[in-house]
Amino acid sequence: MTDLEKMREKLQNQINYHNILYYQKSKPEISDAEYDELKKKLAAIEPEAYATQDSVGAPPDERFSKVEHQEPMLSLENAYDEQGVEKFLSKIKRFLIADEIEILCEPKIDGLSFSAIYEDGKFVKAATRGDGFVGEDVTHNVATIKGFPKFLQDVQGRLEVRGEIYISNSDFLKLNENNEFANPRNAAAGSLKQLNANITAKRPLRYFAYSLIGGIEKSQSEVLEKLEKLGFCVNEHRSLTSSLNGMLKFYNEIYDCRYNLDYDIDGIVYKVNDLVLQSRLGSTHKAPRSALAYKFSAIYAKTKLNKIFIQVGRTGVLTPVADLVPVNIGGVLVSRASLHNQDEIKRKDIREGDVVTIKRAGDVIPQIVKVDEGSRHTNMPEFVFPDICPECGSKVQIEGVAVRCPEEFNCKAQIVEKLKHFVSKDAFDIVGLGEKQIKFFYDLELIRQIPDIFILEERLKEFSLKEHHGWGEKSIANLLSAIQSRRVISLDRFIFSLGIRFIGQVVAELLANYYVSYDNWYNSMSSNDVELVGIDGIGEKVAESLKSFFSQERNIKMLNDLTAYLQILPVSSNSSDSFLNNKIIVFTGKLRAMSRGEAKVRAKVLGAKISSSLSTKTDYLIAGEDPGSKYKKAMELGVEILDEEQWNRLC
């Protein structure tokens, strides 16, 4: 084999490797610009071989059924500077022999491409991009996405909708409590590619639709308007222009405001607006000639990693954080970066003293993407993750990728974080009681557990707070007034405020809606009657976490002490006028649009009574896929049977 052939093979192997990391595993190790550079090098060595490559992604994941795309899901050509955009516009003008062409500009969402098929208005299939020609079947998972249309009114024949699935930055921060995911795209990919759709249903997936195949629209702008009318989520940021200046103006406007968006974008997509002209332009084997992705300049910088320190969170998870020599990235001074977990440190071989490349994306904490091993001194040791908690000295426990301190009642860091969570905006929202004040009161032994907050006024009668810097009569009065005003709270916020592991806002709301009152919830949990939670589809992790929490006598005492100072409002229901009020309902089979637990919660909120067995008193059987023997029995008993679509319309 010649040196040139060896180089070609090496480049091809590198490209294939990075294709799998990006498209299948959603764990890219290099930037888009570096990836494009590999492709350019291969093209320079053997243009013809490169031009005949078929793949535009990665092979489909073997765990999923395969779906062949009737029209390939091609990738887009990229540009990284204004010259690339100008070249694209000039090229299509020459091809079409036109002086002016209307271009639609849209943000490029940093998510996962999907395709959804509808037959006579009914949602029947969803697939990932895969290699562009064959994708993975993710129908049941896409069906769980909140607000995703399952039926389109007045649509006949086959219609295909394409778009991008993502997780918002705010949802990502809530979801990633245990630092399981590196970024929102990674979280979205992991959520969409679950073999169990019930897991996907609990993840905050969202989507934007941008393409319609099988419609009668004449332009891309009409396509977006049609998608909106059909009930799909469409990105509001878009602009029509016929000039290079207009294209660049939109790029600059979005570039400047991108950090105000609650989702990641990595550039702008330019599309020829006229669909007839798109068809005339056609495509190469990899990308349509009618579109271009103008990627944002990578927001990277190199700096030195001084030290890796460990933070202990509310649930005891130990998270490594990099302390950096401060560096300016995109106008922001960065001095810390997330290292996620010990597996991430090992995979990238990150060591204290390394020169590292930092990437800043959106509002997510900056990340280390690469180590400059050439700058590393020979005697720099590997980082050893601690086997004891740096805050309390307890032996840690390994749980998957997470390392946890088990001493939740004795570890100062965990107690302080729990107190911070309890008073946070989405929980009790006590103004004036932030991290600084909590640590201050903790060190003075005035607040050592949650109930102490509500007896702080009593304790301060025997303590001269005004002697301490920053505290005067007014600030003390304001704090005590803020605490007093938060003695009445809704059940869902109360459950969320406790900081129980895996109980976020969504699960807290599900529990509140199911149990309706605090007494119902407390009595059920403290009597170990959490089997119901598992049946409802809230999940094994949540059920086990609740069991663990209520098995601790100190938690039971804390709840009893705390609730003595509070009024916890039951869930109000406007179910009296509901069609389902006082109706007895039984569920059977698999539901596609929501988990069984969510369906039962919705039914209870509407006033229905849920039963696990059929009888002549049953009003409705809600039948999903593979309903089993209950379906036959319902027919024998004369019970009215509703399919999932009918059920969705009711609730």
UniProtKB/Swiss-Prot annotation:
<dbReference type="InterPro" id="IPR041663">
    <property type="entry name" value="DisA/LigA_HHH"/>
</dbReference>
<dbReference type="InterPro" id="IPR012340">
    <property type="entry name" value="NA-bd_OB-fold"/>
</dbReference>
<keyword id="KW-0479">Metal-binding</keyword>
<protein>
    <recommendedName>
        <fullName>DNA ligase</fullName>
        <ecNumber>6.5.1.2</ecNumber>
    </recommendedName>
</protein>
<dbReference type="InterPro" id="IPR010994">
    <property type="entry name" value="RuvA_2-like"/>
</dbReference>
<keyword id="KW-0234">DNA repair</keyword>
<feature type="binding site">
    <location>
        <begin position="32"/>
        <end position="36"/>
    </location>
    <ligand>
        <name>NAD(+)</name>
    </ligand>
</feature>
<comment type="function">
    <text>DNA ligase that catalyzes the formation of phosphodiester linkages between 5'-phosphoryl and 3'-hydroxyl groups in double-stranded DNA using NAD as a coenzyme and as the energy source for the reaction. It is essential for DNA replication and repair of damaged DNA.</text>
</comment>
<keyword id="KW-0464">Manganese</keyword>
<dbReference type="InterPro" id="IPR004150">
    <property type="entry name" value="NAD_DNA_ligase_OB"/>
</dbReference>
<dbReference type="GO" id="GO:0046872">
    <property type="term" value="F:metal ion binding"/>
</dbReference>
<keyword id="KW-0235">DNA replication</keyword>
<feature type="active site" description="N6-AMP-lysine intermediate">
    <location>
        <position position="108"/>
    </location>
</feature>
<dbReference type="Pfam" id="PF00533">
    <property type="entry name" value="BRCT"/>
</dbReference>
<feature type="binding site">
    <location>
        <position position="271"/>
    </location>
    <ligand>
        <name>NAD(+)</name>
    </ligand>
</feature>
<dbReference type="InterPro" id="IPR013840">
    <property type="entry name" value="DNAligase_N"/>
</dbReference>
<feature type="domain" description="BRCT">
    <location>
        <begin position="575"/>
        <end position="651"/>
    </location>
</feature>
<feature type="binding site">
    <location>
        <position position="389"/>
    </location>
    <ligand>
        <name>Zn(2+)</name>
    </ligand>
</feature>
<dbReference type="InterPro" id="IPR018239">
    <property type="entry name" value="DNA_ligase_AS"/>
</dbReference>
<dbReference type="Pfam" id="PF22745">
    <property type="entry name" value="Nlig-Ia"/>
</dbReference>
<keyword id="KW-0862">Zinc</keyword>
<dbReference type="InterPro" id="IPR001679">
    <property type="entry name" value="DNA_ligase"/>
</dbReference>
<dbReference type="GO" id="GO:0003911">
    <property type="term" value="F:DNA ligase (NAD+) activity"/>
</dbReference>
<dbReference type="Pfam" id="PF01653">
    <property type="entry name" value="DNA_ligase_aden"/>
</dbReference>
<comment type="similarity">
    <text>Belongs to the NAD-dependent DNA ligase family. LigA subfamily.</text>
</comment>
<feature type="binding site">
    <location>
        <position position="106"/>
    </location>
    <ligand>
        <name>NAD(+)</name>
    </ligand>
</feature>
<feature type="binding site">
    <location>
        <position position="392"/>
    </location>
    <ligand>
        <name>Zn(2+)</name>
    </ligand>
</feature>
<feature type="binding site">
    <location>
        <position position="411"/>
    </location>
    <ligand>
        <name>Zn(2+)</name>
    </ligand>
</feature>
<dbReference type="InterPro" id="IPR001357">
    <property type="entry name" value="BRCT_dom"/>
</dbReference>
<keyword id="KW-0436">Ligase</keyword>
<keyword id="KW-0227">DNA damage</keyword>
<dbReference type="InterPro" id="IPR036420">
    <property type="entry name" value="BRCT_dom_sf"/>
</dbReference>
<feature type="binding site">
    <location>
        <position position="129"/>
    </location>
    <ligand>
        <name>NAD(+)</name>
    </ligand>
</feature>
<dbReference type="Pfam" id="PF03120">
    <property type="entry name" value="DNA_ligase_OB"/>
</dbReference>
<dbReference type="Pfam" id="PF12826">
    <property type="entry name" value="HHH_2"/>
</dbReference>
<dbReference type="GO" id="GO:0005829">
    <property type="term" value="C:cytosol"/>
</dbReference>
<dbReference type="InterPro" id="IPR033136">
    <property type="entry name" value="DNA_ligase_CS"/>
</dbReference>
<dbReference type="InterPro" id="IPR013839">
    <property type="entry name" value="DNAligase_adenylation"/>
</dbReference>
<keyword id="KW-0520">NAD</keyword>
<dbReference type="GO" id="GO:0006260">
    <property type="term" value="P:DNA replication"/>
</dbReference>
<feature type="binding site">
    <location>
        <position position="295"/>
    </location>
    <ligand>
        <name>NAD(+)</name>
    </ligand>
</feature>
<keyword id="KW-0460">Magnesium</keyword>
